[in-house]
Swiss-Prot record:
The lineage of its organism: Bacteria, Pseudomonadati, Pseudomonadota, Gammaproteobacteria, Vibrionales. This is 5-methyltetrahydropteroyltriglutamate--homocysteine methyltransferase. The active site is at 699 (proton donor). L-homocysteine binds at residues 436-438, 489, 604. Pathway: Amino-acid biosynthesis; L-methionine biosynthesis via de novo pathway; L-methionine from L-homocysteine (MetE route): step 1/1.
Length: 760
């Protein structure tokens, strides 16, 4: 019997972001719901056709989402927060939960969106389910069942996908005190029983139930919850229990006791688990081997995967299935659109559409199809050739990596000495004021950038236009009387892509979009070779800005770990090595900035915490190399050069040691929404260096009053000595307009001056 092939999910945004543009038109009122739904139906039909035409055994349905798949599950279960409830849940209900509802939109006091957070350690996000003790669950929104009917009527053999009950509970949060959301499990399971009964009535043979939390180090009560859950929802539909992003080593003994029919494991993220899983797989179970990486853009070495899976095929026979490691929603849609890539570079990649073909081809090869076996070998040649290419593995970069020593990551003087030097050179007042780096990216800037990229604006004219925006930003900051200025980053489209475009070793794409959440898509650059800086990147802009003012101008860099986390990494070397290469390139930029007279340099690291591995036992090793990469990038700074870093997290406690180990002279953090509560971690740790807790929530259009900012600064001063405090917004101001930016910053400067006078 032929090897069963399938994927865990397919990108829903469309190859040219058709879903994004339709959603935003609908939200603006430019199209009605019928037109929006037609776009969704057309995308689903195309996605299913891609899978069937490639020869997959199953076509996956239920993976389409109008915002994110967790929110889709929330509506399926009729579990809508009370502030958004009212009548039967529909598409507008879903958008209200995800985006919030203004006072004008509902004729009421408005209703806040539910929280959003990262989907495990990916750059995808989901709307967090809210739980209270009186919650009930009832199958409500029929989208899943309608999609199955659509797919069946189109002639596809359907395998629906459903987020599992235990993961759904785990990924949410309690919104009232004194109760544990796990106590809701029996009620939730009643709804899941009804869902599976409905699937059975639709003729579904297999359902993919995603329980990604099985890859975590679960507390006992959560691990134990699976037994009850899967005993109660047992039905006539066969269940493929699906895990991804890490190994199931910690939970495997419990998994194999569950009354399910198969297990999917991620052999891309955790290849080492294969032998253990095969050895413990219960008689009669299917093993779905996730060997085609759903989280990256690289072509699979299918000949190597074939060799790896053949012994498993011999043991399991038709009980071995071949699959993507996780949903392909984390990959761009179709490589064929990238007409501007060189043939060599293009031959290294596979986007979602190509990965579907990889899965199907590998399945045929495992069945002994000689043409497929030969095709796997031919297909894998570019990846094999790449391993020895000198323009990929550059000798000059390797020499620098081999010469990294412990001293390379250390500043030439301890913080206390540096602080004294900096106080003398910089001459800043108590409670110095600054911003985080970016200023409003106006429509004019975006039009000029687009015109330059399409050849309608010459390079010299574009540079003059950017200098005009920088001069304007400097003038506005001087008028506000900020103490440390920034150039505003008018030249940057994105804080990571800008550096990727200016460092050798990266490839950017035209259509390499992946969904972040809702209608927001990102286009990560791809690390294709050893990374090096061939020429200065930011020096010209920073020195031009400094020439316009006698105040200190802050140089602005994105840190090595953030660039790594927000790009598609290479698969042939470790993430640690990529971070070191980035660190060495940024180190050179730091040296050039200070040699050009820039005395303050900010190295942003908003993603250090995001890069944490899923298993806590792996945190220490990651944090050691992540911190070391930052320190390498900063350590070329002289004692009198002040190094800043910026982070925006909601939780510092578990990484405060590592934050301190960065040894930045100043750290700025996002604290305004937490009313300075986040500073507790720094207070309890006795954080030794300077700190700028954000006093202005830039994510809100509300203008903070002078009194409000003053109150926040006073709260901060209760936890951190005032001599070590800075005053700044939470984050960059790129997404705000100038009117609200200047109004907020005027209040920020006034509050700082008032307190400065009181403390004098």
């Amino acid at each position: 019997m032929a090897t069963t092939t399938h994927i865990l999910g397919y990108p829903r945004i469309g190859e040219k972001r058709e879903l994004k543009f339709a959603q935003e038109k609908y939200w603006r009122g430019d199209i009605d719901q019928t037109e929006l739904k037609k776009v969704g139906a057309d995308l689903r039909a195309k996605n299913w056709q891609t899978q069937t035409e490639a020869g997959l055994s199953f076509t996956t349905a239920g993976d389409f989402a109008w915002y994110d798949h967790v929110l889709t599950t929330t509506l399926l279960l009729g579990h809508v927060p009370k502030r958004h409830a009212g009548g039967f849940p529909n598409l507008d209900t879903l958008f209200k939960v995800g985006r919030g509802q203004s006072q004008a939109g509902c004729g009421c006091a408005g209703a806040a969106a539910s929280d959003m957070t990262k989907w495990f350690n990916t750059n995808y996000h989901y709307i967090v389910p809210e739980f209270s003790k009186d919650d009930t669950f009832e199958v409500s929104w029929p989208q899943l069942f309608e999609e199955i009917n659509e797919a069946v009527q189109a002639g596809h053999k359907v395998k629906p996908v459903l987020l599992g009950p235990v993961s759904y509970l785990y990924l949410g949060k309690e919104v009232e005190e004194g109760f544990d959301r796990l106590t809701l499990l029996p009620r939730l399971l009643t709804a899941y029983q009804a869902i599976l009964a409905k699937l059975a009535s639709q003729g579904v043979e297999w359902v993919q139930i995603d329980e990604p939390i099985l890859s975590l180090e679960l507390e006992k009560q959560w691990a134990d919850a699976f037994k009850l859950a899967y005993q109660l929802i047992r039905s006539d539909v066969k269940v493929l229990l699906t895990t991804y992003f890490d190994s199931v080593t910690d939970t495997l003994d419990k998994i194999v006791e569950l009354p399910v029919d198969g297990l999917h494991v991620d052999l891309s993220a955790a290849p080492q688990q294969l032998d253990d899983v095969v050895a413990k797989l219960p008689e009669g179970w299917v093993l779905s081997a996730g060997v085609v990486n759903g989280r990256n853009v690289w072509r699979s070495d299918l000949s190597a995967q074939l060799e790896r899976l053949q012994p498993v095929k011999e043991k399991l026979g038709d009980k071995l299935w071949v699959a993507s490691s996780c949903s392909l929603l984390h990959s761009p849609v179709d490589l064929e659109l990238e007409t501007e890539l060189s043939e060599e570079v293009k031959s290294w990649f596979a986007f979602a559409k190509q990965k579907v073909t990889e899965v199907a081809l590998l399945g045929r090869a495992l069945d002994g199809d000689q043409n497929a076996i030969l095709a796997c070998d031919t297909y894998s040649q570019p990846i094999k050739a790449r391993k020895t290419a000198t323009h990929v593995n550059k000798p000059q970069v390797q020499v620098r990596l081999n010469n990294i020593t412990a001293s390379l990551a250390e500043r030439s003087a301890p913080y206390a000495e540096r602080a004294a030097h900096q106080a003398e050179v910089l001459g800043l007042p108590l409670l110095p004021t600054t911003t985080i780096g970016s200023f409003p990216q106006t429509g004019e800037i975006r039009v000029q950038r687009s015109a330059y990229r399409t050849g309608q604006l010459s390079e010299s004219d574009y540079i003059q236009a950017l200098k005009g925006h920088i001069a304007d930003a400097v003038k506005r900051q001087e008028a506000l009387d900020l103490d440390v200025l920034v150039h505003g980053e008018a030249e940057r489209n994105d804080m990571v892509e800008y550096f990727a475009e200016n460092l050798a070793g990266f490839q950017t794409t035209k259509f390499g979009w992946v969904q972040s959440y809702g209608s927001r898509c990102v286009k990560p650059a791809i690390v294709v070779a050893d990374i090096e800086r061939e020429k200065p990147i930011t020096v010209e802009w920073s020195t031009y800005a400094q020439s316009l003012t006698s105040k200190q101008m802050k140089g602005m860099l994105t840190g090595p770990v953030t660039i790594l986390c927000w790009t598609f990494p290479r698969e042939d070397i470790t993430r640690q090595e990529i971070a070191q290469q980035l660190a060495l390139a940024l180190r050179d930029e730091v040296s050039d900035l200070q040699d050009a007279g820039i005395n303050i340099i900010q190295i942003d690291e908003p993603a250090i915490r995001e890069g944490l591995p899923l298993k806590k036992r792996d945190h220490k090793a990651y944090l050691e190399w992540a911190v070391n990469a930052f320190k390498i990038s900063a350590a070329s700074a002289k004692p009198e050069t002040q190094i800043h870093t910026h982070m925006c997290y909601s939780e510092f406690n578990e990484i405060i040691d590592s934050v301190a180990a960065l040894d930045a002279d100043v750290i700025t953090i996002e604290t305004s929404r937490s009313n300075m509560e986040l500073l507790k971690a720094f207070e309890e740790f006795n954080y030794p260096n300077e700190i700028g807790p954000g006093v202005y929530d830039i994510h809100s259009p509300n203008i903070p009053t002078e009194e409000w900012i003053e109150g926040l600064i006073k709260k901060a001063a209760e936890k951190i000595p005032v001599q070590r405090l800075w005053v700044n917004p939470d984050c960059g101001l790129k997404t705000r307009n100038w009117a609200e930016t200047e109004a907020a910053l005027a209040n920020l400067v006034s509050a700082a001056k008032k307190l400065r006078a009181e403390l004098a």
